[in-house]
């Protein structure tokens, strides 16, 4: 009888690693630093990430498939909020390792909500305590680390800085040790499961999130209507959907200056990501109530609700 592991190359490990935590705790920044390039969009605003996205890192015999998730949060009235919470919760199922990202000192109700879900997973858990580079006296961190260990006794606690990369080598080593023996799921040069169209839409949305600040209308999504390479130029037409005329005016800005700036910043990142000259055109359209319309959300790529 042939052993099921006989076909697995010696030393080969591969598995899924869910990165979970409350909104705006540094999950996407962590993924980007691990991958060594910008893949997941980031901003200072909560709920920037709306979809699960795979970030794939292959180093020698180890392939870690990281799942970047929306932050679990309490505001769940609209269909979009329910979608994000379900998406984040679903990531805890059928993964091989969970990285629970928390802030170095701040603990919220939403952190507690994530903790209560993580306590019931059957796979290994790593607690990544983020932003520890901002603490002058490391001894001040110890009570928080001890408390976290009490909450998840089987978990390994790792102080990190997602922004500066501090201790990420330690975190990745712990992940690799916990991955099962397996053939790799993806080609060595593949870094994500998401399409180029999806990544382009996310870059536009990121620039909107960063530009608008306190004016930010959260009822924004981006559709890519055209994505076509013609010679050396990649032509991208993106439609920005909002829910009200007032939001449309905010995005366009005075004499179109804001949408021009959004487009310029998005185009720069796209040219790096796609290694091509990019011609980006943006339009803004009002689609009332889309963020609370399950049918509209499905048509916009938000999956099952």
Swiss-Prot record:
Cell location: Cytoplasm; Cell inner membrane
GO cellular component terms given for this protein: cytosol; plasma membrane
InterPro entries linked: G_ERA_dom, GTP-bd, GTPase_Era-like, KH_dom-like_a/b, KH_dom_type_2, KH_sf_prok-type, P-loop_NTPase, Small_GTP-bd
Region (G4): 130-133
Residue ranges of the region described as G2: 47-51
Signal peptide: none
Domain Era-type G: from-to ranges: 13-181
UniProt keywords, alphabetically: Cell inner membrane, Cell membrane, Cytoplasm, GTP-binding, Membrane, Nucleotide-binding, Ribosome biogenesis, RNA-binding, rRNA-binding
GO MF annotation list: GTP binding; GTPase activity; ribosomal small subunit binding; rRNA binding; small ribosomal subunit rRNA binding
Region (G3) location: 68-71
Binding, GTP: 21-28, 68-72, 130-133
Pfam families: KH_2 (PF07650), MMR_HSR1 (PF01926)
Residue ranges of the region described as G5: 160-162
GO BP: any one term: ribosomal small subunit assembly
Membrane topology field: Peripheral membrane protein
Recorded family membership: Belongs to the TRAFAC class TrmE-Era-EngA-EngB-Septin-like GTPase superfamily. Era GTPase family.
Protein function: An essential GTPase that binds both GDP and GTP, with rapid nucleotide exchange. Plays a role in 16S rRNA processing and 30S ribosomal subunit biogenesis and possibly also in cell cycle regulation and energy metabolism.
Listed NCBIfam families: era (TIGR00436), PRK00089.1 (NF000908), small_GTP (TIGR00231)
PANTHER family: GTPASE ERA (PTHR42698), GTPASE ERA, MITOCHONDRIAL (PTHR42698:SF1)
Subunit note: Monomer.
Protein name (Swiss-Prot/TrEMBL): GTPase Era
Annotated source species: Pseudomonas aeruginosa (strain ATCC 15692 / DSM 22644 / CIP 104116 / JCM 14847 / LMG 12228 / 1C / PRS 101 / PAO1)
């Amino acid at each position: 009888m042939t052993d099921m592991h006989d076909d697995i190359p010696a030393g080969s490990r591969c598995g899924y690693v869910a990165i979970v935590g409350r909104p705006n705790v540094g999950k996407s920044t962590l993924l980007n630093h691990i991958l060594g390039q910008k893949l997941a969009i980031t901003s200072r605003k909560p709920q920037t990430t709306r979809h699960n996205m795979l970030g794939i890192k292959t180093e020698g015999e180890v392939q870690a498939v990281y799942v970047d998730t929306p932050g679990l949060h309490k505001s769940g009235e609209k269909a979009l909020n329910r979608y994000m919470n379900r998406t984040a919760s679903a990531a805890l199922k059928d993964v091989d390792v969970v990285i629970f990202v928390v802030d170095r000192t701040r603990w919220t109700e939403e952190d507690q909500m994530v903790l209560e879900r993580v306590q019931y997973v059957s796979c290994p858990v790593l607690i990544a305590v983020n932003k520890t580079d901002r603490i002058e006296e490391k001894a001040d961190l110890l009570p928080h680390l001890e408390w976290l260990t009490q909450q998840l006794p089987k978990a390994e606690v790792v102080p990190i800085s997602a922004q500066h990369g501090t201790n990420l080598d330690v975190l990745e080593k712990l992940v690799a040790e916990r991955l099962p023996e397996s053939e790799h799921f993806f080609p060595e040069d593949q870094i994500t499961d998401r399409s180029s169209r999806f990544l382009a839409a996310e870059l536009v949305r990121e620039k909107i999130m960063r530009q608008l600040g306190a004016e930010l209308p959260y009822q924004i999504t981006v559709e890519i209507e055209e994505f076509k390479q013609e010679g050396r130029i990649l032509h991208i037409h993106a439609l920005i959907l909002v829910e009200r005329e007032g939001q449309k005016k905010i995005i366009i800005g005075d004499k179109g200056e804001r949408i021009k700036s959004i487009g310029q910043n998005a185009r720069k990142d796209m040219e790096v990501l796609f290694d091509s000259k990019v011609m980006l055109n943006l339009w803004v359209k009002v689609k009332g109530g889309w963020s609370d319309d399950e049918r509209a959300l499905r048509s916009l790529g938000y999956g099952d609700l």
